[in-house]
Amino acid sequence: VFGGEPEASGHAMALAISNLLGLVCDPVAGLVEIPCVMRNAIGSGNALISADLALAGVKSRIPVDEVIEAMDKVGRNLPAQLRETGLGGLAGTPTGEAIKQKIFGNAEDPVNSFS
């Protein structure tokens, strides 16, 4: 999109992923809405800024392949409550629980309550 060499795209990717490494997935009420929509916007901005940095000659100190490996390891080591279960993080706050209650009522498992 911006031009540049393949090496710059690798640095842009490494910079972008490094900035978001360890970000939890905590959808309120199990819905990909709160806080996901805003995080997607922030992620888009992060990607564009990382691309601009790489095109300006900023290089990731950690090679992109190692950043990807680290991302995999971090993701596997995150507690289950922080991996899109709707149980931890913002989903587990009193307000997050109240939103879930308002949407789904007393359903124990809102994701599977419609089957």
What are the residue ranges of the model-derived segments?
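Functionally critical mobile loop/hinge segments
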Residues: F2-S115
